[in-house]
Amino acid sequence: DKQWIKKNSLGENVLYNLESLCEIMEFKEGMRVLDLGCGKVASAIFLAKEFGVEVWAIDQYITPSENYQRIKEMNCEHSVYPLKLNAKELPFPAHFFDAIVSVDSYMYFGTDEKFTPYISQFLKPGGTIGIVDICFSKEINYLMEVPEFMREHYQDKWYFVHSLDWWNKLWIKTGHLKILNAEIIPQNEFIKKEYVEDFKFSKKSDAIADALAQDKDGLINIFRMTAQRSEKPIDLGNYCMEV
């Protein structure tokens, strides 16, 4: 249901990006999946219905009761479990999940260097993590490098956005993850265009849509990245998270 998806997406159509991730990740019936920053659970519901997996859907801002209503509407109450949690304060045991996904939200909590080993602890060795998010075509290191069209909202919308190369280096730094795939998604131009058109049609203001409309040099893009959990042990005493 296209209208249901739009209604339950925070920003662009979340399933466009999730489907791109599913092209390069393997999900099997009965797997335990963690959906980080699930928003209004559209992604978690899709995974449960499409692949028969169990999904722990966490978000810091959307209430579990609100998400549970959506889950019941789609008859997924026995396979999608909504929780209100900070991504840096998770209660799960080590090696609990077969896969971790994050669609359009990882950059809000995953740029901390300590977060990579922290989140990796919840994956079984050999398990996979996959994200889809916004990136820059080149790294912006100084405020003077920020394009004019982006400067008004840079400090609240863009300063934590990085290049694909930056993300690649972050994930391999501690040896707990082995990169399987890191690239701009094939649907990049289509999804960006749809995002701009959706907000133009709705006549709502959105800083990201406004920036995309003015980005003539292709600075802003959407990437997908997957990695496999290595066998390397994780000593969490070295990776205490600050929340």
Locate predicted features.
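Conserved Class I S-adenosyl-L-methionine
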Residues: 181-243
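Class I SAM-dependent methyltransferase SAM/SAH-binding core
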Residues: 34-36, 40-89
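A short SAM/SAH-binding and catalytic strip from SAM-dependent methyltransferases
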Residues: 99-111
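A short glycine-rich, Lys/Arg-flanked "PGG" loop and its adjoining helix->strand segment in the class I
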Residues: 113-128
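Conserved class I S-adenosyl-L-methionine
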Residues: 1-25, 43
